Amino acid sequence: MNLVPVDTDTHFAHLQQRLANADAAVRRVALVEFADVEDESLLPAIAAMLRRDPDPTLRAEAARALAGWGDGDVVDALADALCDAPQVRSAAALALTELKDPVAGERLVHRTRHTDAFVCAAVLRALRELRIAAAAEPASAALRHADAVVRREAIGVLGWLRHAPALPDLARRAQADADAEVRCAAVGALGLAAAEQAAAVLPALCAALRDAAWQVREEAATTLGKVAQARPLRAVACAALREAMEDDYWQVRLRAARSLGRLRDAEALPVLIEALAHRAGNLRKEAAIALGEVGDTRALAALSAASADPDPEVRKASRLAVQRLS
């Protein structure tokens, strides 16, 4: 059987011509073919399509097709598209999050100061996991942005960078930002505090355990277990976490129990044993695990009783805790 060799160059030349065809249906099929072959030589044509195609649906498709490519012109085209029609800018914003090359991401840093809040937020989101040091200063400035989404994305950048100079601003946001999601993000970012900085963020985290939004309290309970490992801080953190075991939301109690176990707080024995009888199985399971981590044999009787819990996960956690304490 004789196979006729395919002229790849000719095929790509035809594909490039079809990307600029007057018929939108032809251009759409060409875009689909590009997604299959992913030939780098076609990137300029796709970028041009993103910039100039009259059909916003196709511009959005072009943005999706460019996701993950770190070519400079592609990054610029996607960033420019953040000012396009809603469906295009959304596709471009998502495509930018797939950047993997920090060098390509550096082309975006100056756009964090754009006057459009959507652009600022999208660029900060794209920069987050790239961990570009140059993004720290504009992200810190963006903590004061009027738009809550921008502030939240700025916190994400600073958290991924583990940018210690931002801790005081993050502590203030954790307590006083008007938006609950921003407060929650700031509380989580305070977990980046190193041991020598933990004392400075502890008051903000304890205050966050009394936040009006239960999601913020939940995040605070988790973060306290991470940063309060040092003995001088542990007593303060554990006292606040024991109070959180009375929270109206079992989700907050669950995280508090987890942190109390992590901090091995023997004074938490009564509240953890009480949690073994809570209606939420997930909390009962976490309380059993925490009691095993605390390591106090006074919990053996309660854990033995919990080994007959109707929830199999609680039974398993309780039996493992009993083995650990025996």
Per-region residue spans from a language model:
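Core solenoid repeat modules with strong leucine/isoleucine-rich periodicity
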Residues: Q87, A117, A122, A148-V149, ...
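Amphipathic alpha-helical scaffolding segments comprising HEAT/armadillo-like alpha-solenoid repeats
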Residues: V6-R18, D39-R52, D71-C83, D101-R113, ...
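Short inter-helical turns and helix N-cap capping residues of alpha-solenoid HEAT/ARM repeat scaffolds
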Residues: A22-D23, P54-D55, D84-P86, T115-D116, ...
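N-terminal alpha-helical scaffold/docking segments in eukaryotic complex subunits
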Residues: M1-A60, R64, G68, A308, ...
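Ankyrin-repeat and related helical/solenoid repeat scaffolds used for protein-protein interactions
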Residues: W250, L254-A317
